[in-house]
Structure formats: C-alpha cells, structure tokens
Curated annotation (Swiss-Prot):
It catalyses: Hydrolysis of alkylated DNA, releasing 3-methyladenine, 3-methylguanine, 7-methylguanine and 7-methyladenine. This is Putative DNA-3-methyladenine glycosylase YfjP. GO terms for molecular function: alkylated DNA binding; DNA-3-methyladenine glycosylase activity; DNA-7-methylguanine glycosylase activity. Gene3D superfamilies: 1.10.1670.40, Hypothetical protein, domain 2.
Length: 287
C-alpha cells in the first residue's frame, strides 16, 4: 500500500467538494472522516480504489492520498479529477468584479471537480438528460449496480465493452426509455469498436469536440457541454438550456421569470473566460 501527502494552493474547500459528491449515491463519501474513496480503472482496465482524505482546511489545503497499487498513474488521475493544479484565486479575483461577486464570496474555494472518467461522465449525462435529478440518480445507480463492478464496497461504472454487449431490453428492464437505452448502448458500442475515441478528446479544442460528439444520436449540446465541463475540466462552458442554471439566475437576480437564452448569453459575457465556474457556483447557490 502507498500513501502520499499533497499540499494544494489555497483556497480549496474540500468539505464543499464532499457536499457535492454526496448528492450522488454512487460516491463513497464519508463527511465525518472528510474523505472519499475513488474508483479508477488503471491502464489494464482493472479497478483501483484510491482514498482521498482532507488534513487541512480551505486556507491551508492538504490531503493524504492512499491506494494499493499504481501510485504514479493513480496520483495523476486524482490530481486531474480534483483539479489540484488549477489555482482558484485567479477565478475568485475575476468574479470579485462581476455581478456574481456575492455568490463567489459565499462559496469561495469551491473547485470544479470532475467525474471519475470521461466515459462515466458521458453515460451519466445521457442517462440524466430530461429527467428530474432524483430519478436521474436512481437510474444511474441501477445501471451501475446491474452492470458495473464493486470493489471494497465502492461501485465503479461498467466498461463500454460491457454495455456494448447488452440488448436494449436489458436497460428497459431498469426503466430506461427505449430511446435512452438505444443512446446508452449505441454510444458504448461506438467506443468499444473504436469508432469514437475518448482518449483523443483531451487533445481537442472545445469547438472540435462539440462538432464531433453532436453527430452522435442522443447527444445534444447540453450533454456535450457537461462532458466538456465535468469530463474534461474545460473552464469556459455555460449550458444555456440547463434548468438549474436558469432557476439560479432567476433567484440571484430576482427576476419574475426564468431568463431567456439570449438574456443569459448577454449576462455571461462578463464571466468569461471562467463560465464553467459561473455555472458551478450558480448551481451551488440553489443546492
């Protein structure tokens, strides 16, 4: 077993990370111990469980990271997932001069934390689209429990190769709509067959990823934007069609109705180039 201490540039509020992670019942979060156990597939495709425990506080963030094997590979992934090499002070300084300054002051130090893999993120987005959040989490939980892997009490999303072999009825039995079953399985087949390479995405520009993924049946702009944000950690995404964002803006700016997309677009100009953080902090303001 290996252990490694990591210090991160402040501010970094890990308790708020745990708050958000705990919204998903699949995440192995222990708030009292201030830790999360993260399932990561190594290059061989095997599931490794990595524990991340907070030792410090938002002003002096320090973590103890531990696992059984593959220390170098796992540490690289943990730093990517938790965005430890991105300095939040630059983001906070930017928003201190904008109409979202109050929200950023209240939630200061909240990082943009990624899903544990791009495939996980893509499947979650496809499954969650056009569902209320409660049932969306129920459906992803059923999906992972039925076809994923459990190690040391922690659930990991299935491999695309596993889902590629399913029949649509296998997902219909979990209360997937027919279309959602088709989108989930067909996209997984593209990945398993090599028609869609997820390993290429980190090296592509946002616009090129949008053009590539939007051609896939069942993947629309909202899904691509969320994959860019929570799968790849891109900093400048603002999903205008997101109901949560619309509600957060309505509440923050005390509007009578949810804002139209052109209004949201005009508002968001001053928040660039950190629109993903504007999205995250607006969501946090209504959670």
């Amino acid at each position: 077993m290996w252990k490694e201490k990591v210090s991160v540039t402040p501010p970094y509020h890990f308790d708020r990370v745990l708050d958000r992670l705990s919204l998903d019942p699949l995440n192995a979060v222990d708030r009292e111990a201030r830790e999360v156990r993260v399932p990561i597939r190594n290059q061989a495709g095997d599931v490794c469980i990595v524990k991340v425990q907070a030792l410090g506080h938002a002003g002096e963030p320090e973590f103890l990271v531990s696992g059984e094997t593959d220390q170098g590979e796992m540490m690289k992934e943990i730093k990517r997932i938790f965005q430890w090499e991105n300095h939040l002070q630059h983001v906070l300084d930017h928003f201190s001069k904008t109409s979202l300054s109050a929200i950023f002051e209240e939630h200061a130090g909240t990082p943009l934390v990624l899903d544990y893999s791009v495939y996980n993120c893509m499947m979650k987005c496809i499954i969650h689209q056009q569902l209320n959040l409660s049932f969306a989490y129920t459906l992803t939980e059923r999906f992972v429990h039925a076809f994923g892997e459990q190690k040391d009490g922690v659930w990991c999303y299935p491999k695309p190769e596993t889902i590629a072999e399913l029949d649509y009825q296998d997902l219909r039995d979990l209360q997937f709509s027919m279309r959602k079953a088709e989108y989930t399985i067909d996209t997984s087949r593209m990945i398993a067959e090599g028609t869609l390479s997820l390993s290429e995405l980190p090296h592509m520009a946002d616009e090129d990823i949008m053009k590539k993924l939007i051609k896939i049946r069942g993947i629309g702009p909202w899904t691509v934007q969320n994959v860019l944000m929570f799968g790849l950690g891109r900093p400048n995404l603002f999903p205008l069609a997101d109901i949560g964002l619309q509600n957060a803006i309505k509440r923050h700016f005390q509007l009578d109705d949810k804002p139209a997309k052109d209004v949201m677009l005009a508002m968001s100009k001053e928040w660039e180039p950190y629109l993903s953080y504007a999205s995250l902090y607006l969501w946090r303001s209504i959670e």
